[in-house]
Structures are given as structure tokens and as C-alpha cells.
Amino acid sequence: MSRQINAVTPSSSSRRHRLSLSRRRINFTTSPEALPSSSSRSQPSSSSRSQPYSSSRSQPYSSSRRRRRQERSQEQRVSEDNVQIIGNANEPLTRTYHSQGVTYHVHGQVNISNDDPLLSQEDDTIESVDRASQQYQNSIASETAAQRALQRGLDLESQLMSEISPRSPAYSPPYPSNDVLSQSPDLFDSPQSPQQHELELEDEDEEEEEEEGEEVEVSCNICFTTLKDTKNVDSSFVTSIDCNHAVCFKCYVRIIMDNSTYKCFCSASSSDFRVYNKHGYVEFMPLTLIRNRDSIKQHWRELLENNTVNNRIIDLNDVERLERERSELRAKNSQVEHKMTMLNCDYAMLKHEHKITELKLKWANRDLEEFTKKTQELQSTVNDLQEQLRKQVAESQAKFSQFERRNSELVAELYTIEMSKP
């Protein structure tokens, strides 16, 4: 059995309540309208987009595109959470099962054995699941029909509103000869053609957003002014339809003002011009030429009032303040550099003094060791002399006592002799 499941399978306890094909084979053949396919699930999003499309001129295109993208991602997450695929998803759908709030799609010829835990119930359970799946398919079919009716009503309402609403004074119809969108017959095949066109534009915008634009420096062929444009996205140059020499807008206006007709440096004259961007190009031609030196002054006056914040006094004050701050920072930087130089000098001197002190300490330790040795030698000599002196004193005392005793004996003997004489 080869089976591929693209979602988290339920636990073993919930598998006991699923379909069983041990005694008979269940084959649900559902029509494409009743299947919970991506088209039926995307109906609410398309219906929700139909009304904003009728008023797309009053809302920014970026916000509606972001909302549609969020709805699409949310629907995709919900569909992926509730659908499991068995078999190869590239093969055609053969069977569909629904149990425990999860829809199982079987693609291709999948051999499912009778001992599969997905199919572990008796016939009565099969009949109940059969009825539940039939009710689910009926509810899906009714919901799909209601969504289609709602979508049809919204499309008719938007079509009526577009026909009834008056056009604005600034409305300019597209050129039927050059506009590719107006020539496409697909826009008039069904009431959902505006939504399809909008989805196509959205897909194109998403593809363009994924591609990172490369900024390229391009120079004008006349004034050689270098402009930076994004490759394959936008262009700041005007191109004649008779030659391929692109010029900037300033040179184009100057040539028109000088010659009344545009004549390129390659001697090619033309009255039609093109300006390109990522969506296509715009053809235009100069209609009216008015020579008035005050018009540029009025134009710049409006630019300074509406497009820029250009106050000469404020700019000068800012420049003076920045110059002052730069001077102060330079002075502080000089002081810091001077302090760093002094500190480096002090550090070098302290480093030398440290080395000298270490050398002196080494010498002092050596002298201390020598003095300690000499002191120990002298101490041993003093001890020897003291011992010798003690011995000499003891010998002297013994000798003196012996002399005294002998002297007393001799004196007594002499006295005895003198007394014995007649």
C-alpha cells in the first residue's frame, strides 16, 4: 500500500471511528460543484472583492491588494488544516471520505487493505458515516449555490452602479488601438471578468515584487546628465518613435521650445513620443506651445508653496548653526586630542618608571638576601664566641677557687710551722 498524507494524522483512538471496507467497497463520486475545492472555498473572497472593485477609484489599490492577499492566505491555511490527501496529488481524484471534521481525498489507484487502521469499523458504522458524508456534501452544495447566487447579485449590482454612476470630468477613455486590455475578449465572457482581470494584475504585481529591481545609472544623449532608474521598472527618459535615442525631459522641452518640432541629433524628426514604465508605455505629442517667461516663475512659485519646504532664512540659520556646532566640535576634538597626547606621554613615563622601580626592587631583594646571609654568619660567630667566653669564665672561676683553697692551706701550714719553733 502506497499512501501519502500531507497533514497530521489523527490519534489511534480516533481511528476506531473511521470508515471500514472489510465487507463492501465505498466509492463516493461527487460532482465538481459539490467538492470542497479551492474554487468553491475562494467564492467568499471573490464575493467580498466584487464590491470594492466597483469603488476601486476611491480606494487605494495597495490596500485592496493587501486585503485580498490576507484573505487568500487565510483560506489556504483553513483548507490545508481540514484536508488530507492520500496517494499522489498529481493524479486525478477517485474517492472522497469525510470523518471527524477532516476530508480525505484519494488520488489515483491506491490499494487500501482491510486491516488498515483508517478502515476499522463495522457495516453499521459505514452506513452512519455514509449518511454523514452525504449530509456534508449536500451542505457544501447548498452553500456553494448560495455563494454563487450572492456573487451573481453583487456582480449585477456593481454592473448597474457602473452604468448609472456619472463619469468624472477628469475621466479619459483608454486608446482602443494601443490598449491591450480593451482588445481582450476574455473581459466580456462572464460577469466575473473584472475580478479575473484584477486577480491577473495582482499575480503580476506579486511576481514583480518578488523580483528585486536593479538600479542603473543612465545618461542623457544630449546633456549627459546621469539619472538613476530601476531596470525594467521605470524610466526617466523620453523616446521618439522614429529613433532609439532617449533624452531627458529637460532636453526634450528645450528642443521643443527652440525648434517647435522635435528633431533628434541624428536628424530624425518626430511628433509622437513614448514614456515607459513596468506596465507599458504612454504615447503623447506636443499640442500647444506657449512662449511665456513668467510661466516658469509661476510654476516654481507653486512648487515652493505646495511641493517643498524651502525657506531661505531657515536654511541659512540651519547652516550657521551647523557651522557653529562643527567649529565647537572641532575645538573639543582638538582638546581631546591634546589630552590624549599628554596622557600617552604620562603613560610612557610611568611605564619607564615602573620598569626602573622593578629593577631597583630586584637589586634590593638581592642585597637583602646577601645581608641576610651575612647576618646569619655573624649570628653563628657571636654564638660561638659567647660559648667560648662562658667556658673561659667557668675555667677561670674553677682556677681561682683552687688557688684560694691552696693558698689557705699554705697559710695554715706556715702558721703551724712558726708556732712549733722554740
UniProtKB/Swiss-Prot annotation:
Coiled coil: 314-414
Sequence ranges of Low complexity compositional bias: 36-63
Cellular component aspect of the GO annotation: host cell nucleus
UniProt catalytic activity: S-ubiquitinyl-[E2 ubiquitin-conjugating enzyme]-L-cysteine + [acceptor protein]-L-lysine = [E2 ubiquitin-conjugating enzyme]-L-cysteine + N(6)-ubiquitinyl-[acceptor protein]-L-lysine
Comp. bias regions, Basic and acidic residues: 71-80
Entry keyword Zinc: yes
Annotated EC: 2.3.2.27
Keywords for this protein: Coiled coil, Early protein, Host nucleus, Host-virus interaction, Metal-binding, Modulation of host ubiquitin pathway by viral E3 ligase, Modulation of host ubiquitin pathway by virus, Transferase, Ubl conjugation, Ubl conjugation pathway, Zinc, Zinc-finger
Location in the cell: Host nucleus
The keyword RNA-binding is assigned to this record: no
GO molecular function: transferase activity; zinc ion binding
Composition skew (Polar residues), residue ranges: 1-10, 179-196
Post-translational modification: Auto-ubiquitinated.
ZnF RING-type span: 220-268
Family, similarity comment: Belongs to the alphabaculovirus IE2 protein family.
Task of the protein: RING-finger E3 ubiquitin ligase that plays an important regulatory role during the initial stages of infection. Migrates to specific nuclear foci early in infection supposely to prepare the sites for viral replication by targeting and ubiquitinating host proteins.
Protein name per Swiss-Prot or TrEMBL: E3 ubiquitin-protein ligase IE2
Gene: IE2
